[in-house]
Design a protein with these regions (language model features):
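Interhelical loop and helix-boundary elements at the membrane-water interface
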Residues: 1-66, 70, 77-112, 122-153
Length: 153
């Protein structure tokens, strides 16, 4: 769970500290055939890099191979990018709320793919996904009040 929280939280904290510096959107502003951007301007290379760095450090602190932390972060960010892609295709605004779609892909994908490496059971994976959903639901409004998140979700 700490790997997930570190990978997911790193881009948010990095944005808080760096503001608008080094912001390079992953989709480079490209649009899909529906006229909407592929992912949106909030999905940046800076965010992916910060997730990888923080999750690999967290893995090291947890006694897990840093390479597992790198893969965990990359899979977490891939899940987040897939969710953003789906939200754009559904016509949802950038950074809009979409319960489940906002949390399930980025928690399920790394846990599922790294199940063996992290010695997770299917029950563990289900609990990780559920717990991450609940943390996002209840902690995000607090982080918004503290001006760490830009939205209360």
């Amino acid at each position: 769970m700490l790997l997930l929280l570190s990978a997911n939280g790193a881009p948010v904290l990095t944005r808080t500290f760096l503001k608008h510096r080094y912001v390079y959107p992953v989709d480079a502003g490209l649009k899909w055939s529906d006229g909407h951007r592929l992912l949106g301007r909030s999905k940046t290379w800076r965010g992916i890099l910060s997730a990888v760095m923080v999750a690999s450090l967290m893995a090291l602190l947890l006694g897990i191979a840093p390479l597992i932390g790198v893969w965990f972060a990359l899979l977490t960010m891939l899940g987040d990018l897939l969710a953003s892609f789906c939200k754009r295709r559904l016509g949802k605004q950038e950074s809009s709320r979409s319960r489940g779609l906002d949390t399930v892909p980025e928690s399920l994908l790394p846990a599922w793919v790294l199940k063996e490496s992290l010695l997770l059971s299917y029950v563990d994976i289900a609990l990780i996904v559920l717990l991450f959903f609940l943390i996002e639901e209840f902690i995000s409004p607090i982080l918004y009040k503290w001006h760490i998140r830009q939205r209360p979700y």
